[in-house]
Amino acid sequence: MQVAGKELEVQQGALCGEVLKEALSKKQFKNVVVAKCGDTLLDLTTTVPADCTDLEPVMADSKEGLEVIRHSTAHLMAEAVKKLFPTAKVTIGPSIASGFYYDFDYERPFTPEDLEAIEAEMLRRVGANEEFTREVLSSADALKKFEEMGEDYKIELINDLGEETVSVYTNGEFADLCRGPHVARTGMLKAFKLLSVAGAYWRGDENRQQLQRIYGTAFPDPKALKKHLAQIEEAKKRDHRKLGTQLDLFSVNPEVGAGMTIWHPKGALIRAILEDFERKEHLKRGYQFVQGPLILKRELWEKSGHYDNYRENMYFTEIDEQSYGIKPMNCLSHMLVFKSRLRSYRDLPQRYFEHGVVHRHEKSGVLHGLLRVRTFTQDDAHLICRPDQLRDEIIGVAKFVGDVMGLFGFEYEAEVSTKPEKAIGSDEDWDRATEALEGALKEMGMEYSINEGDGAFYGPKIDIIIKDALERRWQCATIQCDFTLPERFDLSYVGEDGERHRPVMLHRVILGSIERFIGVLLEHTGGALPAWLSPVQAKILTVTDSQNEFAQKVLQFLREKGIRAEVDDRNEKLGYKVREAQLEKIPYMLVIGDKEVAAESVNVRARDGEDPGLKSLEEAAELISTAIDEPFKRGGMSYSFS
């Protein structure tokens, strides 16, 4: 069989670790976490499957290897918690994108001192180099085992699984219900850090037991961990909630409700500029503007399938004994626009666009500033086309996304998400849609990965993942294929043959949630938004009251040039005014003293530390305007806010 790219003769009953050790150098094998046969990950202590023809090592620095390390570290943490707090009950502890967590049921809150003690105990267990062992038990034996341990949550999980057998992993004195796989020994888990404690509900149900979730992170080596912890500290400084207050952009008031944003004047202006930019770009690309109501009759949501598949995330109200659903998506109104008149094949594609306000019931525990909210605005479009136009429409949207993300300086990558367990539509439709999405990306030469089972319930999708300045990944743009809703709403067009035909539809967003995108952009830039998007592009700072009259003249001049400017003529020291403007992330400060008044000029200071110095009003305006226009010229675009 093939082992790590080599042809080896493997004896029946050989262990994965033994076989890989023979195929690899000592240095290489030291970094092997688990083995892989096909799509299946295997413990190194597992016997090589009889039908395995290609065994590969999973290295510690790979994506899959990192997930295993983090999952194993979650078990290590649970072992330490049970040692120090024997009455704590364990629930679940998976790896996540940034690390891992484990949820515990314990009678008092865990403190920062507790986390330090848990970490110290984890390090002792690492030093002991305990083995991770896997045991397959009948469900009856597993129930007996966890009943003796008093682990009620594990008992519930076993009962819900309904399997004849389950696997249990043991490290040291700790046993856990788990599919695995895990590292061979705790000695491999040397680079970890416990980060915080948060509340959680058992199985995400707010009506069930409240638990304590300990978050942590782990890496293959201390250097990678140190880099990540430095990024966490930088992220705290860039937290968009902190910047939102500092820059006076938005607030979330408990009197209004959780997950609902109040936009202040400067924040509302940022939104208005973004939306204006998007409207103009959509017009250039042949989109038509539409707008639908906030609430629609429940029967429409039943017809679309949302009521059966999405109602737990929706809000409902009753008017005149008629049930209405507050829209979580904008697609239904757009389809009714298409259906409002007879369409010819010559009319297609139809591209409908709306900045639509939607409401979704997100659980309170996941709400987070602008990044996770209950009411938000989507830059939502639906492209209804002939099947032969589908690939070109996907390519057009993907290029649109690339232009916009390039404008903001984001690197991005694509993921194709395939059919989930809970889905509507035939396998044939899903296969056709998935092939169209992948084919478009291949035609563009865009690399992509497959995200199995993560499509929406009504169709596969392309997610565009952007990477910010802290190397965090965010999903913003989505291109989603849908053969199902045109069928449910009986959409049709008259073909060249004079017969009725069914169109196909793309759901798509570019920025996604406007709120979320602004939150991501604030953290990406640390609040120093590009000049074109800054609510105030220049601040005029006077040295004394004697310059106030000229400052107003400068203000009027800049505004006539289309530059958003303010005057700070308070009776404060210049240094104080400069520091405050820097905290407000103003792109340009224009200082006016007696010398500048006499020369009818300004002294320009840039946010990035450059000091252009004394400039005439025309020169200063030209300098600022060039900075505003530069990102658009770089991308072959043009824009002015109006």
From Swiss-Prot:
It is found in: Cytoplasm. The keyword Ligase applies. Binds 1 zinc ion per subunit. It is an enzyme of class 6 (ligase). Residues 1-58 form the TGS domain. Disulfide bonds: none annotated. Its EC number is 6.1.1.3. It catalyses: tRNA(Thr) + L-threonine + ATP = L-threonyl-tRNA(Thr) + AMP + diphosphate + H(+). Its cofactor is Zn(2+). Keywords: Aminoacyl-tRNA synthetase, ATP-binding, Cytoplasm, Ligase, Metal-binding, Nucleotide-binding, Protein biosynthesis, RNA-binding, tRNA-binding, Zinc. GO terms for biological process: threonyl-tRNA aminoacylation. Pfam families: HGTP_anticodon (PF03129), tRNA-synt_2b (PF00587), tRNA_SAD (PF07973). GO terms for molecular function: ATP binding; metal ion binding; threonine-tRNA ligase activity; tRNA binding. Zn(2+) binds at residues 331, 382, 507. GO terms for cellular component: cytosol. Coiled coil: none annotated. Belongs to the class-II aminoacyl-tRNA synthetase family. Catalyzes the attachment of threonine to tRNA(Thr) in a two-step reaction: L-threonine is first activated by ATP to form Thr-AMP and then transferred to the acceptor end of tRNA(Thr). Also edits incorrectly charged L-seryl-tRNA(Thr). NCBIfam families: thrS. This is Threonine--tRNA ligase. It comes from Maridesulfovibrio salexigens (strain ATCC 14822 / DSM 2638 / NCIMB 8403 / VKM B-1763). The lineage of its organism: Bacteria, Pseudomonadati, Thermodesulfobacteriota, Desulfovibrionia, Desulfovibrionales. The gene is thrS.
